[in-house]
């Protein structure tokens, strides 16, 4: 699929997950919850820690859902993860795979903070069927060029085609306004480790006919 910001969208393969984790590490380096959870003051070290963390996270999500990428030429520049209804939360095996990435090479207490963060989000996960959006990230050097909007537009087209409910979490106020443009509304707010978080839902539309 081509978009008006000259990118192509496609589903990621397992071999694409490492470059996707690199993008997440760079793009989400300064997200407030990530800063608080990993407690690494040096930005580059924090970026590398997040890359290690997201490798097993993406592997699990790849098995439970879909991960779409945005490409310029052959370069991956954005990702959009989606968990299928009923498969939002990581399995016990996934949690074990993530554990070394948060225990080794990170400050003492990082693992416990990540667990508390994950539990806080899981506790608020809607009971009804829904597609769970996230993570969504764009390579920092090409942000604000319409790539995120292209990914979200494609996501919403799929949701509307099935009349499906979508749900997400974010720790950035700017993201709240971004997602509202695509029909999401805030359904709850809470502090997670002292960081404001917003929980958003998008109602299911009418399935397309034909």
Task: State where each predicted segment sits.
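Conserved N-terminal entry element of GNAT/NAT acetyltransferase domains
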Residues: 1-18, 22, 26
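A short helix-loop-beta-strand connector motif used in the catalytic cores of GNAT acetyltransferases and
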Residues: 48-69, 128-132
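Conserved beta-hairpin
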Residues: 63-80, 139
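Conserved acyl-donor/pantetheine-binding loop and adjacent beta-alpha core of acyl/acetyltransferases
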Residues: 76-137, 143
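Conserved GNAT acetyl-CoA-binding A-motif
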Residues: 129-131, 158-171
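Conserved acetyl-CoA-binding loop-helix of GNAT-fold acetyltransferases
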Residues: 138, 144-157
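Conserved active-site alpha-helix within GNAT-family acetyltransferase domains
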Residues: 149, 161-162, 172-189, 193-196
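C-terminal "cap" of GNAT-fold acetyltransferases
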Residues: 164-173, 192-210
């Amino acid at each position: 699929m081509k978009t008006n910001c000259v990118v192509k969208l496609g589903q990621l393969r397992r071999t694409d997950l490492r470059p996707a984790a690199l993008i997440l590490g760079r793009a989400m380096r300064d997200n407030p919850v990530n800063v608080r959870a990993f407690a690494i003051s040096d930005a580059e070290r924090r970026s590398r820690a997040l890359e290690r963390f997201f490798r097993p996270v993406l592997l699990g999500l790849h098995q439970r859902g879909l991960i779409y990428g945005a490409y310029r030429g052959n370069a991956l520049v954005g990702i959009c993860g989606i968990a299928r209804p009923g498969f939002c939360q990581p399995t016990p095996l996934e949690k074990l795979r993530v554990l070394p990435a948060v225990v080794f090479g990170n400050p003492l207490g990082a693992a416990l903070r990540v667990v508390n963060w994950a539990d806080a989000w899981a506790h608020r996960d809607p009971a009804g069927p829904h597609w769970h959006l996230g993570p969504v990230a764009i390579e920092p050097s090409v942000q604000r060029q319409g790539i995120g909007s292209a990914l979200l537009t494609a996501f919403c087209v799929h949701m509307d085609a099935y009349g499906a409910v979508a749900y997400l979490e974010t720790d950035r106020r700017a993201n709240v306004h971004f997602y509202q443009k695509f029909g999401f509304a805030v359904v709850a707010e809470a502090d997670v480790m002292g960081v404001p978080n917003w929980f958003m839902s998008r109602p299911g539309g009418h399935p397309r006919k034909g």
